[in-house]
């Protein structure tokens, strides 16, 4: 029986230059694997707790030495000797060990690092790719990437309110062709921005951060880039938004669009989305309303839920209980999947299974603070999520995931690229 022999955590850096955890697990056959935990910038208030040191003399208070120590002492002590390939049991032990609903004691960053590293070590020991270990024989589907090519909101220092403007290459037969087309659009967009004397500096997720004066200009220039690159707008490549509305709302559920000097209530904002969807081939809107505006979400879902994908990120925070509430209230029709929002691989799996059971789409997602770790690429294929958000075709921490998906596609001798089939069920 393969058991856990050793566990260790190290403070390393993420793509924003902030510290994060690298956890390593050694098994009884001396197989070793590591995992690096990501970190978000715009976070939902109900996310599991990311434990930081708050020691202002180190990393401006963002150190993770306490979380590392939790791995190297408490977690290590209680997990050594447990069966390695029983992921659910080990993850449940981690939850019990912490004793809080949101990992406030050990830190979700400490717990997730160990959970990820254990899965990777177990797969390695069994000589299986991670996607095959986690997903079994059914792990065959390559996800449609949602590439964030213009950044705004908290991901960029500009006047654009919406956090992410994305392209979705739906009209292609393979992942590699979809990615190639996306890269070509990205480079074409850069030339167009240069021609408009716009900055082509990039945000946290590799998208450009031009200083446009309103939230419509990015849709216009991206549409131009798609067509100039030689692709059919809406047919081969569609558009998607992550509004991150929780960053725009006040205590009265009024939404402040500073780039356009507008203050809108929930119904007015939904009307604005309807105008955009009518004018542009937008197939998905994420966090269209605040995580606390459930009444507004119900209206948004009623007005647009049969027409486009409505993704809950801050709304659900990868939490099965919150997703169940959304299902019961007919709110949204898709859930963003971020393992570090909930804490362990097993809890993430629970949320994905619940979503699939109720015909909610699943979007595997990175965080704005990432690393070279490509775990979510395997995870997306393992669970056939059908979609993945992992930034633009720039910045190596984003490219690491795309390159891993290209490897997986090659290993699967093509696999299945879901493409246009993604939204056909609805």
Swiss-Prot record:
PROSITE patterns: ENOLASE
Active site location: 205 (proton donor), 338 (proton acceptor)
Subcellular location: Cytoplasm; Secreted; Cell surface
GO cellular component entries: cell surface; extracellular region; phosphopyruvate hydratase complex
Known cofactor(s): Mg(2+)
GO biological process terms, semicolon-separated: glycolytic process
NCBIfam families noted in UniProt: eno (TIGR01060)
Protein name: Enolase
Protein source organism: Helicobacter pylori (strain ATCC 700392 / 26695) (Campylobacter pylori)
